[in-house]
Amino acid sequence: MKSIKRFALSAMGVAMLLVLTGCVNVDKTTGQPTGFIWNTIGAPMAEAIKYFATDKGLGFGVAIIIVTIIVRLIILPLGIYQSWKATLHSEKMNALKHVLEPHQTRLKEATTQEEKLEAQQALFAAQKEHGISMFGGVGCFPILLQMPFFSAIYFAAQHTEGVAQASYLGIPLGSPSMILVACAGVLYYLQSLLSLHGVEDEMQREQIKKMIYMSPLMIVVFSLFSPASVTLYWVVGGFMMILQQFIVNYIVRPKLRKKVREELAKNPPKASAFSKPSGRKDVTPEQPTAITSKKKHKNRNAGKQRSR
C-alpha cells in the first residue's frame, strides 16, 4: 500500500508539471508560447483576455477571471465525470465495508513481509471480485482531456500582451503576490477538506488525509515563482474546484449512494473468508487429551498396586 501511495504522490507531481508546461511549447529565443495547443486553444484565450480587458474596458484582472470561469465551465462536465467515478468507488467501499474490513484488519496486524503480502493479495482479490479499482476509480482519459485547457489558460494568463504591466486591486499582475498566493493555498486546502465529505472507509480516509496537503502545497510553491496573473487564475480555479466539490458532495454522491445500495440489496455480497496465514502452526497440545492420558496412567498404576 505504501508503494501505491508513493506512486500516487509522484504521479500528482508529474501531472502538475505536464499540465503547466507539457502541452504548450515555448520558443527558446523569444520565450513566447508556440505549438499546436497554443495556436488552437491558448491564443484564442489570450485574445479573449485582451477583448475583455481593452475593448470592454474591464481591466486585465477581471478579464482573466471571466476567461478562467468560461474555460472552467467548459471542462466542468469532464471534472464532474472524473469525480463521479471516484465517488462511485468511494460509495462501493463504504457499502462493502463489512466485506473488506477483515482484510484491512489482517493487513494492519500483519507482522512479517509474507503476511503483509498475503493480506494485500487477499484485499486486492476481494476488491476485484466486487468491481472496486485499487487506483480509486480515477481514469486517465478525463484528466488528459483537461490538460490542454489548463496549460493554455496558464500561458494565456502569463503571456497576453499588456498583462505584465497591468494591476488588479492594487496588485501588480507582472510579479508574484503573496496575498494571492495565500488565497490560492487556502482555497485548494478547503477543496481538499471537502473531498473527505461522505468518505466512511477508514483506510480510504487515511489515504486522503495524507494527500490533503499536496495540492495546496504544490499550488503555493508554483505561485511563489509565478506572476500574479497566473496566481489569480489559480485563485479563480480554486473557487471553481470548490463549486465542483459541492456538486459532487450534495448532488452526485447521494444519487450514487442510493444506486449502490439498491444494487447490493438485489445482489447482497457474501462476507469474504480467508484462512490463517500459512507458516503458522498451532503446536499447543489439546488439554483434554493430556488429562485423559494422566487418568490412564493413574488407573494402570492402581491395578499394579492391587495385585501386589
UniProtKB/Swiss-Prot annotation:
Relate the protein's function as given in its record: Required for the insertion and/or proper folding and/or complex formation of integral membrane proteins into the membrane. Involved in integration of membrane proteins that insert both dependently and independently of the Sec translocase complex, as well as at least some lipoproteins.
Entry's Pfam families? Answer: 60KD_IMP
Q: Classify the main location.
A: membrane
Membrane-spanning segments: 60-80, 135-155, 168-188, 211-226, 232-252
Q: Report what the protein is called.
A: Membrane protein insertase YidC 1
User: Where is there biased composition of kind Basic residues?
Assistant: 293-308
Any one GO CC term of the record: plasma membrane
Name the gene. yidC1
Task: Give the keywords, sorted.
Answer: Cell membrane, Chaperone, Lipoprotein, Membrane, Palmitate, Protein transport, Signal, Transmembrane, Transmembrane helix, Transport
Q: Which InterPro entries match?
A: YidC/ALB3/OXA1/COX18, YidC/Oxa/ALB_C, YidC/YidC1/YidC2_Firmicutes, YidC_ALB_C
Localized where?
Answer: Cell membrane
Report the family membership: Belongs to the OXA1/ALB3/YidC family. Type 2 subfamily.
Which portions of the sequence form the region Disordered? 263-308
* Protein's membrane topology: Multi-pass membrane protein
A GO biological process of this protein is:
protein insertion into membrane
